[in-house]
Regions:
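Extreme N-terminal starter segment of soluble prokaryotic enzymes
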Residues: 7-13
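Cofactor-binding loop segments of dinucleotide-utilizing enzymes, especially the Rossmann-like FAD-
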Residues: 15-17, 42, 97
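Glycine-rich His-Gly loop
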Residues: 15-18, 59-63, 146
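Short N-terminal binding/cap micro-motifs at the start of the first secondary-structure element
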Residues: 20-25
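Flexible gly/pro-rich beta->alpha loop and the following alpha-helix that scaffold active-site loops
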Residues: 28-93
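Catalytic nucleophile loop
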Residues: 85-109
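Pocket-forming structural segment of enzyme catalytic cores
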Residues: 106-155
Length: 155
């Protein structure tokens, strides 16, 4: 995110699915790059400003499944807004449930995995020399999920 070539707004929007699940170490990276973070809580806040935002929006995780919209009806509006956001090619990152929501919005199947993945491993960042998130390369991150998804077409 070189300031001479970056035209993104200097605020990152993040959609939470639990109030205590935030950006963690990633927030420090954005802070070091001069970005502020504004959080929106799914099911509580109006997500339209985050989903319509021209800058980077990060969709975070949570202990729910994409396929649980009957129990979590806010997912339907979030998915609808996410489909439009992706159609408009707005910068979007999905972490955990967020990645599942993006896959679903792009037409991929999201489903319960054969077994849960729980544990720590090192994050591997691709194209480290040109990646604004390269500061995270090699850090230990927690994996804790039971759902998985097929890659969307052309991903």
């Amino acid at each position: 995110m070189n300031s001479s070539t970056n035209t993104l707004p200097k605020t990152v929007y993040a959609i939470q699915h639990l109030a205590f699940e935030d950006l963690g170490s990633l927030e420090h990276v954005f802070d070091q790059l001069g970005y502020r973070v504004r959080y929106f809580e799914a099911g509580v806040d109006d997500l339209r400003p985050a989903l319509n935002y021209d800058g980077l929006t990060i969709i975070l995780g949570g202990p729910i499944g994409v396929y649980e919209s009957e129990d979590y009806p806010f997912l339907l509006d979030e998915i609808t807004g996410l489909k439009q956001r992706l159609h408009d090619h707005k910068p979007t990152i999905g972490i955990c449930l967020g990645a599942q929501l993006i896959a679903h919005a792009l037409g991929a199947k999201v489903y319960a995995g054969h077994q849960k993945e729980i544990g720590w491993s090192q994050l591997q960042i691709s194209a480290v020399d040109h990646n604004p998130l390269s500061a995270l390369n090699g850090i230990e991150v927690l994996h804790w999920h039971g759902d998985t998804f097929d890659l969307p077409e052309n991903a």
